[in-house]
Design a protein with these regions (language model features):
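Structured mid-to-C-terminal alpha-helical surface segments
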Residues: 1-12, 22-29, 40-276
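Glycine-rich beta-strand-to-loop/alpha-helix junction loops that act as flexible
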Residues: 14-18
Length: 276
């Protein structure tokens, strides 16, 4: 769904799926989540520095998310409520659930509603992009409709997103191996990395001092940032590989522009692992 509040664009920063799909149109999959940074009004005095973790600082961020929940008004949205299930421990990110009246048959594999993941993650460097949706792009060719696209929204650089996707895969793989859970919830990140590796600008970014610096800053100590040695990208264990391939296929309904096979994704990772 498009972000309609174009009048608020100086305060909006798109990242993650929102930036890759709706801003740069690199990936073609659905998501219930909208990853976005909305700058708090100065009057709220929300503390957003990464080292501001005192109880009063955390409370200021909680107050901001509560304010945002009460402030959001979007055509077609019937309710707006906090969803604390995805909240970061220190509330550097938090969930807001948007619900709407569904007029079509629900798609298997998609949760109802939209989860707005608001937070204060790094969103620079970025560039202005118009935010659209597959529904708008289709409908505008058929009938006259209101242009509800958000124009010139600052979208996070895809090269930096690649680093963060690699870290996400690594961390989620490690936790999945510890818990034994079925890994459906993060298989989409393998697809995202595959698509990012097709982009010339991302290819040019890999190996640069900025790329290496972002890896150093973003990977936790528990994860091996050397991709060619990290088991999350090798999947040499046959049972684990089969489990992941099955989980990837189980999410097929998410991909509206088709998708590569999981073997193709792993083959691409094998080609790039020495540079990543």
């Amino acid at each position: 769904m498009p972000l309609r509040a174009a009048e608020a664009r100086p305060h909006l920063r798109a990242q993650g799926w929102t930036s890759l799909s709706k801003g740069f149109q690199i990936i073609g999959r659905f998501s219930e989540d909208i990853d976005i940074r909305i700058e708090p009004p100065a009057a709220l005095d929300a503390k957003v520095g990464k080292n501001q973790t005192k109880p009063a600082h955390i409370q200021s961020r909680s107050d901001f998310y509560d304010w945002l929940t009460k402030t959001i008004v979007i055509d077609g949205i019937t309710s707006v409520a906090r969803d604390t299930s995805v909240d970061n421990r220190d509330l550097f990110s938090a969930g807001i659930r948007l619900t709407y009246k569904n007029v079509v048959t629900p798609v298997e594999g998609l949760r109802e509603g939209v989860l707005l993941e608001a937070g204060f993650a790094k969103v620079t460097p970025n560039e202005p992009r118009d935010i659209s949706s597959w529904a708008y792009d289709y409908a505008v060719q058929k009938v006259e409709i209101i242009d509800n696209r958000a124009k010139a929204v600052a979208c996070y650089d895809p090269g930096y997103t690649l680093v963060e996707k690699l870290q996400t895969i690594s961390s989620k793989y490690r936790r999945q191996q510890e818990s034994g859970d079925i890994p459906v919830d993060f298989m989409r990140h393998y697809y995202d990395v595959y698509r990012l590796l097709q982009q010339p600008s991302v290819q040019a970014f890999i190996g640069t001092p900025e790329y290496l610096k972002h890896k150093d800053e973003h990977f936790p100590r528990a994860d091996n940032k050397n991709i060619r040695e990290n088991p999350a990208f090798l999947l040499t264990d046959e049972k684990t590989r089969a489990l992941y391939e099955s989980a990837y296929e189980a999410g097929s309904a998410l991909y509206y522009q088709g998708k590569p096979s999981f073997r193709e994704i792993l083959a691409t990772l094998a080609e790039w692992k020495d540079r990543l």
